[in-house]
Design a protein with these regions (language model features):
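A short beta-strand-turn-helix
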Residues: 1-13, 36-39
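Short amphipathic alpha-helix with an adjacent loop that forms part of the alpha/beta core around
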Residues: 3-8, 88-96
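Short pre-active-site segment immediately N-terminal to redox-active cysteine/selenocysteine motifs
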Residues: 11-13, 18-21, 28, 53, ...
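Hydrophobic beta-strand anchors of alpha/beta hydrolase catalytic cores
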Residues: 14-15, 46, 105
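Solvent-exposed loop/turn segments at secondary-structure junctions
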Residues: 19-24, 51-56, 82-85, 114, ...
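Structural microenvironment flanking redox-active thiols in thiol-disulfide oxidoreductases
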Residues: 27-72, 84-93
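Structural micro-motif
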Residues: 72-76, 94-106
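Thiol-/selenol-based redox modules, centered on thioredoxin-like
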Residues: 101-146
Length: 146
């Protein structure tokens, strides 16, 4: 994924560092899908950067397709290699200092300036905290597309 990619020109982005094995990612992905549906027409694009347990591209792509089907995801999921620390450092650490949690959502405005980085995700079991986090994500997405 590059800033120069024509698909993302003039669009606000939520870039999600995730994995199909990550329990909090399982809770976050449907929320991101709803944001894509709600704000996509206004120029929001959600992109998942997936780090998988298996570094076998065929197996990882199969897992990603199953994941997309399970949650009805229409946004882009890109396989970025294994969760091996060296691979993760190579892929993202030079662009994102202090990455430490799956999922990490990066909220980027239409001029491609990072507005917020959100690490972790509070799932439905947290009750009011989950609902507050959904409202926070919705407000962030709304601001990105203005």
């Amino acid at each position: 994924m590059r800033d120069s990619d024509e698909r993302f020109k003039g669009k606000a982005l939520i870039v999600d560092i995730m994995g199909t094995w990550c329990h909090n990612c399982l809770d976050e992905s449907p929320v991101l899908q709803r944001l894509q549906e709600q704000f996509g027409k206004d120029g929001l694009e959600v992109v998942g950067l997936s780090f998988e347990i298996s570094d076998d591209p065929a197996q990882a792509r199969k897992n990603l397709q199953l994941y997309k089907n399970r949650f009805g995801l229409t946004y882009t999921l890109l396989f970025c290699g294994s969760i091996d620390d060296e691979n993760v450092k190579k892929q993202i650490h030079s662009q994102l200092n202090n990455f430490f949690a799956y999922p990490t959502a990066i909220f980027i405005d239409k001029s491609h300036q990072v507005q917020t980085i959100h690490s972790g995700f509070k799932g439905p079991g947290t009750g009011d905290e989950f609902q507050a986090q959904i409202r926070e994500f919705e407000e962030l997405a709304r601001k990105l597309v203005q």
